Amino acid sequence: MSDDITSEAQTIAVGQLRAFIERIERLEEEKKTIGDDIKEVYAELKSSGFDSKVVRTIIRLRKKEDHERQEEEAMLQLYMDALGMS
């Protein structure tokens, strides 16, 4: 009986592992598709005359909280001033 329980537990564990792996594989494929879609949008953006590097910077900044962004901008300005770049 103990062997039956162990065998059943192993079967369940293998099934769970397989399910996790298959979910990850599906998500990785979706991630690739989304990445391709994003590249297409950037290509459209560029063909419309927008600077994709600047847009990427804006997107990065929009992800931050206001205080984080302001702190980063202040540090950037401080460093630029120190280097005579302002």
UniProtKB/Swiss-Prot annotation:
Alphabetized HAMAP family for the sequence: UPF0335
Similarity comment: family membership: Belongs to the UPF0335 family.
Species name: Brucella canis (strain ATCC 23365 / NCTC 10854 / RM-666)
GO molecular function, one term: DNA binding
Lineage: superkingdom: Bacteria
The protein, known as: UPF0335 protein BCAN_A1790
